[in-house]
């Protein structure tokens, strides 16, 4: 089954002349269309806001595109807060969701006026001691435990996740926070990852809406927003059907009208923290075939490796591969597509049926727009690749340069004996 890239071979050949492989390429047109569709799908909710999960793709150029559509930033670390501040996302444009949180991160989040989403009951006292007060607007992360199911399918196992408060802790947290001066409360939950179904958000929403009604009734705390977090996935495999964000939005609306409106809670804002859904399909890793090996298996070695895309090595994740210029040729060759790391799991594909690949062929590895570059690392002394934006007008723009050896050795610059040698 075909799954075609958002860029043509002709376009890519020109881009490669300016930016050598490997690099991550992003599709501005697709990003904009998707952000607009999300905004329209939840336009029925007056307070709706998407907080883009910065961890997925921490690039200010891409986040600024999303900000044109009203998106804020979901941050989970000090440097993500720094990045958000640098692009002008401060105050209620930041949702700070962290766990095992260092004191300095709470201090910085509070300084920026971010909405703080508490992961643990013990963080209430820790936060108050750290910043000297409890913010008037506060959120708590909820974990119901057990398994999360849609129909008879188990989607994930929240009971095994390190995140969030139990039901009892959540009720107690609202009471304690209210007594300490909090006035506007939020509920946050992330119960399944990369779901390719239109049912996940509506089911999660109904559960959280019912919880919100009970919380407000029993604690007297004003529930101002409900954060559905992330979890809406993308079709990595060509045979998968993409989620329909319009259907998802309508499903959440139906639950809202069934549960919150009758309870007199029609002012509750809906927040999301999508990362993969926002950018995943609109990025790809562009690499060249540089080596072939014929032993017990057929191998094609690329100039990219797991440093540039960790998901296949770490999770065994599937990423579709297109051999550019051979989109219509038969997939009659079985290959392992590898990088050059000294690790046998450095493989983008195992036993993948593809057209015959020749040295010098350009390979596009799909769906790397989220958790692609962001999960990069420097094992084996490998350097992270550049990021390039395919603009709406067809031009290509560098939005992050590739690392250099100087970057790699930069943390030794305080030692005189290495200043001139590295």
Ranges and model annotations:
Residues 58-61, 102, 125, 147-148, ...:
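Flexible loop/turn segments at secondary-structure boundaries
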Residues 11, 27-30, 34, 38, ...:
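General structural feature for long, well-ordered alpha-helical segments within catalytic domains
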Residues 260-261, 265-422:
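Charged (often Lys/Glu-rich) extended helix/loop segments that serve as interaction or gating elements
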Residues 130, 144-291:
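Active-site loop/helix belt of alpha/beta enzymes
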Residues 137-143:
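ATP-grasp fold ATP-binding core
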Residues 53, 97, 119, 141, ...:
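Generic beta-strand/beta-sheet core signal
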Residues 1-136, 175-179, 183, 217, ...:
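A charged N-terminal "starter" segment
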Residues 31, 55, 77, 109, ...:
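Conserved, mostly hydrophobic/aromatic
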């Amino acid at each position: 089954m075909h799954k075609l890239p958002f860029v043509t071979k002709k376009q890519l050949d020109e881009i490669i002349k300016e930016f050598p492989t490997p690099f991550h390429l992003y599709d501005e047109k697709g990003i904009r269309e998707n952000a607009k569709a999300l905004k329209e799908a939840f336009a029925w909710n007056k307070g709706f806001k998407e907080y883009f999960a910065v961890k997925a793709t921490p690039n200010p150029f891409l986040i600024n595109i999303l900000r044109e559509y009203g998106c804020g930033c979901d941050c989970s670390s000090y440097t993500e807060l720094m990045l958000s501040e640098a692009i002008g996302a401060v105050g209620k444009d930041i949702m700070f969701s962290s766990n095992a949180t260092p004191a300095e991160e709470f201090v910085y989040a509070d300084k920026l006026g971010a909405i703080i989403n508490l992961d643990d009951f013990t963080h209430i006292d820790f936060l108050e001691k750290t910043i000297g007060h409890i913010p008037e607007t506060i959120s708590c992360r909820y974990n119901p435990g057990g398994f999360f199911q849609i129909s008879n399918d188990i989607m994930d196992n929240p009971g095994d996740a390190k995140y969030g408060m139990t039901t009892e802790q959540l009720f107690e947290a609202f009471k304690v926070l209210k007594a300490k001066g909090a006035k506007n409360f939020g509920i946050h939950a992330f119960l399944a990852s990369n779901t390719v179904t239109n049912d996940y958000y509506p089911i999660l929403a109904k559960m959280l809406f019912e919880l919100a009604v009970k919380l407000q009734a029993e604690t007297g705390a004003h529930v101002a927003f409900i954060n559905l977090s992330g979890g809406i996935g993308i079709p990595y495999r060509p045979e998968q059907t993409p989620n329909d964000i319009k259907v998802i939005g309508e499903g959440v609306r139906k639950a809202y009208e069934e549960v919150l409106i009758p309870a007199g809670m029609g002012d509750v804002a809906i927040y999301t923290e999508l990362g993969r859904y926002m950018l995943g399909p609109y990025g790809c890793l562009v690499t060249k075939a540089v080596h072939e090996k014929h032993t017990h298996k057929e191998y094609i070695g690329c100039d990219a490796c797991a440093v540039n895309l960790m998901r296949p090595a770490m999770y065994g994740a599937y990423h579709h591969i297109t051999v550019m210029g051979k989109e219509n040729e038969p997939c009659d060759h079985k290959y392992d597509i590898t990088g050059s790391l000294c690790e046998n799991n450095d493989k983008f594909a195992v036993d993948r049926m593809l057209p015959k690949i020749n040295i010098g062929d350009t390979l596009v590895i799909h769906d790397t727009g989220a958790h692609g570059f962001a999960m990069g690392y420097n094992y084996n002394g490998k350097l992270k690749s550049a990021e390039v934006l395919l603009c709406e007008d067809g031009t290509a723009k560098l939005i992050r340069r590739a690392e250099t050896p100087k970057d790699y050795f930069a943390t030794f610059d305080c030692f005189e004996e290495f200043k001139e040698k590295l």
